[in-house]
Amino acid sequence: MTLKTLTATLVASLAFAPLAHADITIGLIAPLTGPVAAYGDQVKNGAQTAVDEINKKGGILGEKVVLELADDAGEPKQGVSAANKVVGDGIRFVVGPVTSGVAIPVSDVLAENGVLMVTPTATAPDLTKRGLTNVLRTCGRDDQQAEVAAKYVLKNFKDKRVAIVNDKGAYGKGLADAFKATLNAGGITEVVNDAITPGDKDFSALTTRIKSEKVDVVYFGGYHPEGGLLARQLHDLAANATIIGGDGLSNTEFWAIGTDAAGGTIFTNASDATKSPDSKAAADALAAKNIPAEAFTLNAYAAVEVLKAGIEKAGSAEDAEAVATALKDGKEIPTAIGKVTYGETGDLTSQSFSLYKWEAGKIVAAE
């Protein structure tokens, strides 16, 4: 066979060969290690299950979806490193980050490199207030959930003494500031307003002050590691105050740390999506893997569904900006948390929060 004949044969064979599809890779930036790894596990489980279910049905635009994990350990610097890895790997879409303190710096890195992120859990208002076009969420904001908590206190603890404590982070301080604004506007001024440092174990100075001030309600802006310890130390001091917080107290690790002292703690979280028929397929897929259909897990599942919808609307996974624009067309997107629509900021156009309570290691409705 001559070289000319061989070349012609190869060209002909390539012309009739089926085109190979490139995988669509979604990066997951989450705390897979560290003190808030429990949240990372929930988000990873939700996102991976959604990817698996999508692939069972043919993928996105006929292409297989792959989830690539990047551990941020709940630390902003490590989050930036994870974001740079995602960018270096040529990934255009990200689920996460999980915590607001990590999500804000990561969003800047991703924006500079044309990567679209959908966070299932980062609730700080500042995340979507900075004019970035590449940030969306499948959760509400801290100002929304803190307002729900403050109105609950104004209604049920009128004329009682309130303390506000935060962990100095974007999430915790954001919650505390928003809670204070609504509380003060409603006529209650807190008697204690203090902060703790994540990683600290001894809150004796704070708990002693709370007891001496005869505080009835402690609003805590922060996550479960410190929240559980605070509950236990208040209980040990016989400071009979009700703890109220945000969705950072929704994890079972909060109960594991606080044990019985965590009983009666009230927290805000997204209204129960499992009550909607929209969540059934996701809940069934999770149940098949023995994974509870918890709020953060369903939010992560929904984040993958949002990316799928955006890519299909745009007709391609090549341009993340085009996908982001397509998602903000005002049309409903069916997800595991219900039908969602997005405004120009990347926030959900509607999001409801409910109040829950810890009782004997179980989460029940607070009202």
From Swiss-Prot:
The keyword Signal applies. Residues 1-22 form the signal peptide. GO terms for cellular component: ATP-binding cassette (ABC) transporter complex, substrate-binding subunit-containing; periplasmic space. Transmembrane segments: none annotated. Keywords: Amino-acid transport, Periplasm, Signal, Transport. One of its GO terms (biological process) is valine transport. Disruption phenotype: Reduced uptake of amino acids Glu, Asp, Ala, Leu, Ile and Val by bacteroids that lack this gene and the genes aapJ and braC from the two ABC uptake systems of branched-chain amino acids. Pea plants inoculated with the triple mutant bacteroids are defective in symbiosis; the plants are yellow, have increased numbers of small pale pink root nodules, dry weights similar to uninoculated control plants and 30% acetylene reduction compared to plants inoculated with wild-type bacteroids. Pfam families: Peripla_BP_6. It is found in: Periplasm. The complex is composed of two ATP-binding proteins (BraF and BraG), two transmembrane proteins (BraD and BraE) and a solute-binding protein (BraC or BraC3). Part of the ABC transporter complex BraDEFGC/C3 involved in transport of branched-chain amino acids Leu, Ile and Val (LIV). Essential for the development of bacteroids, the differentiated legume-symbiotic forms of this bacterium, and for the effective N(2) fixation by them. Belongs to the leucine-binding protein family. This is Leu/Ile/Val-binding protein BraC3. The gene is braC3.
